[in-house]
Amino acid sequence: MTELILFDLDGTLTDSAPGITRCVQYALTYLGKPRYEPEELNCFLGPPLKEQFMKFAGLTEEEADTAVEQYRERYNGIGIYENEVYEGIPELLEFLKKHGKKLGVASSKPQVYVEEILRHFGLEKRFDVIVGSELDGT
């Protein structure tokens, strides 16, 4: 039987905190919310954006939709590239592939972003399966 090893993207393969927290701050500033230190926004690493905007900043559903739009406005051209692959990850993936393991990425981040980040860092060919959410959060 072939083994499949799944990895998350954010916080596992890449340190995406700088790009995510800067985009969150951009969205909150757009809505006239206070400025937060990047460390205060680390709670946005992982969970779905809309729900986290509502929980963290007390936004209404409509405001959270606007926050997500603003987040993505900055993320699409800038924030997506404000991250880096953790040290040793390329070597680990290569080792696992050489030992016959199937590798996959499963992320709550939209699939188009997952694929672009993996492409940007030259990692996409190391994965047999890449799964992310849709832009609408499904």
List PLM regions with ranges.
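Metal-dependent phosphoesterase signature
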Residues: 54-91
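Helix-loop "lid/cap" segments that line or gate small-molecule binding pockets
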Residues: 27-28, 48-61, 117
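Substrate-recognition "cap/lid" segment bordering the active-site pocket of phosphatases
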Residues: 111-138
